[in-house]
Design a protein with these regions (language model features):
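Conserved glycine-rich Rossmann-like NAD(P)H-binding loop of the short-chain dehydrogenase/reductase
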Residues: 28-45
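Conserved NAD(P)H cofactor-binding loop of Rossmann-fold oxidoreductase domains
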Residues: 90-95
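C-terminal helical subdomain
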Residues: 183, 205-241
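Substrate-binding pocket helix/loop in short-chain dehydrogenase/reductase
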Residues: 98-100, 106-111
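Active-site helix of classical SDR
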Residues: 122, 158-159
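Residue(s) in the substrate-gating loop at a strand-loop-helix junction
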Residues: 142
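Conserved glycine-rich cofactor-binding loop
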Residues: 14-15
Length: 268
C-alpha cells in the first residue's frame, strides 16, 4: 500500500460526505479520528469501519461552533495518545431563510464552523505534518464557492470561496514538504445535509437528476485528488461546466440567472 497507514482526522464525520470520506480512508487502510456533534451516529460509524477494515477508528465528540473547539479537540486527541497525519475539514451547515431572517447566532456559528475552525485546525495540524514530511489536508468546499452569489443562503458561497482560496494558498506554501492540500468542490450531492436544512424536496424538484452525485463517488474523487496533490477538484462534468461558466459570465447576467434558481427554490 503506497500511502502507508496513517491517522486521518475528519470533521463532520457522522453523515454525508464526511462519513463517505471516512469509508474511503478506512478502505485504504488508514486509521481514523472521527469528530462531529452527534455521539450515537459517530460511534456507530467508528465501530462499523473498525470491524469492516481492521483499522483503529476513534470517535471524539466536538461542536466546532463553540469557542476554542479546535484547540480542545486537539487536546482530546493528544490525551488519547494519537497524532494527526491527515486532516479533512468537512463540517458545515447552511441556513436558507435569507440574511435578515436568519438568527445572527446562526450566522456566527456558520462562520466558526466553516471558516474559523478550518483555519485553526490547519494551524494546529500542519506544523507536525511538515516536520514529519507527510500530510494530507482535504478541505471540503463547494461548487457554490466558484459560482455567483445567491440570495437566501447569503453567507454559504462566500465562506466556501474563502476555503478554496485558503487551500490554494496552503498548497503553494507546502510544495516540497510532503504535505498535500486540496479543496474539494462538490455540487449537488445526495446526503442528509438537505434534510437538516429542510431543502431536500425543493432541490430535488428544481434540478435534474444528472446534476446530482453520490456522496461515496464524491469522496473517492476528493481523496484521489489530495493523493495526487491537486490544489482543487470539482467532481462531475456538469459541475465543471457550471464552474467555468460562473467565472466567464458578466456579473449582471450571472446574478440574474442564479436569482432565477433562487426564486424557484423559494429563496433556497
Amino acid at each position: 500500500m503506497g500511502e502507508g497507514r496513517r491517522t486521518i482526522l475528519i470533521t463532520g464525520a457522522s453523515a454525508g460526505i464526511g462519513a463517505a470520506l471516512a469509508r474511503v480512508c478506512a478502505a485504504r487502510g488508514h486509521d481514523l479520528i472521527l469528530t462531529a456533534r452527534r455521539e450515537g451516529p459517530l460511534q456507530a460509524l467508528a465501530e462499523d469501519l473498525a470491524a469492516a477494515h481492521g483499522v483503529a477508528a476513534t470517535a471524539v465528540v466536538a461542536d466546532l461552533a463553540e469557542p476554542n473547539a479546535p484547540a480542545r479537540l486537539f487536546e482530546a486527541i493528544a490525551a488519547r495518545g494519537l497524532r494527526v497525519d491527515g486532516l479533512v475539514n468537512n463540517a458545515g451547515f447552511s441556513r436558507t431563510t435569507g440574511f435578515l431572517a436568519t438568527d445572527p447566532a446562526d450566522h456566527a456559528a456558520m462562520i466558526r464552523v466553516m471558516l474559523t475552525a478550518p483555519v485553526e485546525l490547519s494551524r494546529l495540524a500542519l506544523p507536525d505534518m511538515v516536520a514529519r514530511g507527510w500530510g494530507r489536508m482535504l478541505n471540503v468546499a463547494s461548487l457554490a464557492g466558484q459560482m455567483p452569489a445567491t440570495g437566501g443562503d447569503t453567507l454559504y458561497g462566500p465562506i466556501k470561496s474563502f476555503l478554496i482560496k485558503a487551500s490554494q494558498g496552503l498548497w503553494l506554501e507546502t510544495q516540497g514538504t510532503g504535505v498535500h492540500v486540496t479543496a474539494l468542490c462538490p455540487g449537488y450531492t445526495y446526503t442528509e445535509f438537505h434534510d437538516v436544512n429542510g431543502s431536500r424536496e425543493q432541490v430535488s424538484a428544481a434540478y435534474p437528476k444528472w446534476m446530482w452525485m453520490d456522496a461515496d463517488r464524491v469522496a473517492r474523487i476528493g481523496w484521489d485528488a489530495v493523493e495526487a496533490n491537486r490544489p482543487r477538484v470539482t467532481p462531475g462534468v456538469a459541475n465543471n461546466v457550471l464552474a467555468a461558466l460562473g467565472g466567464l459570465l458578466p456579473d449582471a447576467l450571472a446574478l440574474k440567472m442564479v436569482g432565477g434558481h433562487a426564486r424557484r427554490l423559494d429563496r433556497l
